[in-house]
Amino acid sequence: MRLQKSGHVVNISSSLATQPIAGVAAGLLNLTKGGLESVTGALAMEFAGEGIRFNTIAPGVVNTPMNPVEAHEFLRQLSPMNRLAEVGEIADLLLYLESAPFVNGEVIHLDGGAHAGKW
């Protein structure tokens, strides 16, 4: 990336890194993903002059096999939009970031607004 004077790193975090939920054991997640979100900004500043960008996508609950259908009713309540994110929405956001050369150092939450506060 440095040789070609361009590049883009997109990290994947979690909305839990900055919006913990009571009863959800996420200490290790907070430690690792919180650090990842912090280093995104630091690296964005360090390498911006070389044309290399760093961004992070922080999804909330995503509709994957990791979340069984039986749990969906409860999990939907964790989003003010009352639904789970879809994998394709993460891909869409990634494609947007690839097409937006002036977006750098951002943590973008894909959680229906859950990170914004309580509802």
Question: Language-model segments: which ranges?
Answer:
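C-terminal substrate-recognition "lid" of short-chain dehydrogenase/reductases
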Residues: 86-110, 115
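Residue(s) in the substrate-gating loop at a strand-loop-helix junction
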Residues: 14
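Alpha-helical segment proximal to the catalytic Tyr-Lys
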Residues: 45-49
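Catalytic Tyr-x(3-8)-Lys segment
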Residues: 70-89
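Short, flexible catalytic-loop segment of classical short-chain dehydrogenase/reductase
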Residues: 18, 54, 58-68
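A short helix-coil junction within the Rossmann-fold of NAD(P)-dependent oxidoreductases
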Residues: 1-8, 19
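Active-site helix of classical SDR
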Residues: 32, 40
